[in-house]
Amino acid sequence: MKARLIATGERAPSWVAQGFAEYQKRLSHWLPFELVEIEPGLRGKGRDPRRATEDEGKRVIAALPKNAYVVALDVPGRQLSSEQLAQRLEHWRGQGRDLAFLIGGPEGHSPEVSALADEKWSIGPLTLPHMLVRLVVAEQLYRAAAMLANHPYHRA
C-alpha cells in the first residue's frame, strides 16, 4: 500500500517542503508517501473561478492512482481524532488499496472530484493555508503509523 497527497496550488515554500520531506522520510518504512502538486487553474479579473476549479479537477483525476481509496479534504467533511485516523489506516492496510488524499484549490474540489471521494475529511473548523494542510496531513499520517507500530512518537 502506498499513499499519495495530491495538492492543488503553487509550489510550496521551502519551510513547507522541508517539513513535508521530514515526515515523508519518517513515514517511508511504514507507508510510502508521495506528494503530487497540481497546477492551479487560472484565476483573476474576467476569469470564471468555476472553470479554474473544473480544470484543476481534471488534473487531479489524472493524478489519482488506479483503484485508490480517495479521501478529499473539505471543510464540511468529517473530523477525525489521531486515534481514529490510526484505526482507519489499519483498516486500509487490510484492504491493500493505495490511498489518495486530496487538497483542493481556493474554491475547493470540482464536483467530479467530490463525486469520486470515498470519504471527505475536515482538518477542523479553523481556516488554514492549504500549504500548512500538507504538513498537517503528513504529520498525522506519520502519527497514525507510529501509533500502529507502538512507536513512542504519540504519547496521548
UniProtKB/Swiss-Prot annotation:
Its EC number is 2.1.1.177. It catalyses: pseudouridine(1915) in 23S rRNA + S-adenosyl-L-methionine = N(3)-methylpseudouridine(1915) in 23S rRNA + S-adenosyl-L-homocysteine + H(+). Its main location: cytoplasm. One of its GO terms (cellular component) is cytoplasm. Pfam families: SPOUT_MTase (PF02590). Gene3D superfamilies: 3.40.1280.10. S-adenosyl-L-methionine binds at L73, G104, I123, G124, P125, L126, T127, L128. The keyword Transferase applies. The keyword rRNA processing applies. It comes from the Bacteria. Belongs to the RNA methyltransferase RlmH family. HAMAP family: 23SrRNA_methyltr_H. Homodimer. Specifically methylates the pseudouridine at position 1915 (m3Psi1915) in 23S rRNA. This is Ribosomal RNA large subunit methyltransferase H.
